[in-house]
Amino acid sequence: WDNAYSVHHLYDDEKDQDFLLEILDECEKAGNPDMVYKFTSTSKISFPGSGIAALAASKANLDDIRKYITVQTIGHDKLNQLRHVKFFKDLEGVHAHMKKHAAILRPKFEMVEATLEKELGGLGIGEWTTPKGGYFISFESLDGCAKKIVAMAKEAGVVMTGAGATYPYGKDPKDSNIRIAPSFPPIEELEKAAQVFVVCVKLASVEKLLAE
């Protein structure tokens, strides 16, 4: 269980935040405490690929996996652990830091969502999530259009995550899912990219509908 976005809220007020059920507790209630290994890290909090990782599991699973981890490394990067502790200090320090992330990300998400609603709302050619956290907007096109949309956007200069990237081996049976990642570009570039994207959605959808 990849718990990568446990503190990645876009809004400060708790009523505007999403919280998942604690899966380890639910597994124990269901009589299957050993079903899940839960992983998290500060990779999307401090340093991508160079953060601090953590593993949560049942006592039996932790006892088992320690045998393998002990062989894999005889010493963790304690200096990296120390600098994280000194910087964040405690959980409140993590939350305070993530509010700074949210202040950067929130306007980007809201702009993309507003563009999607203005240009595609009510047309019946696309649906999308309005996430309260994390790094992605999930977009559902008409069946058979996702790869076409991403390819058209690339031709126009907007490089997106490959269509179907969220599916095992990238194979989306309906060819309809596109993962929009608004986090990286400056908002000025993102505005242009969002306009290109909605035009590509319209063009690909019209081509599909005319061919039917």
Q: What does each of the following model-derived ranges do?
A:
Residues W1-N3, T40, A54-A56, T129-T130, ...:
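Short beta-strand segments
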Residues W1-Q17:
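Catalytic PLP-binding core of fold-type I/II PLP enzymes
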Residues D25-R106:
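Conserved core segment of the aminotransferase class I/II
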Residues G31-N32, E155, G170-E212:
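PLP-dependent enzyme catalytic core of the Aspartate aminotransferase-like
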Residues T40-S43, I125-G126, G164-Y169:
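Short, solvent-exposed loop/turn elements at beta->coil junctions and helix N-caps
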Residues K99-E113, I125-E140:
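Conserved glycine-rich beta-strand-loop-beta hairpin in the small C-terminal domain of fold type I
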Residues L142-A146, P185-I187:
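Helix N-cap motif at beta-to-alpha junctions
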Residues V159:
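Residue-level detector of anion-binding/catalytic polar loops
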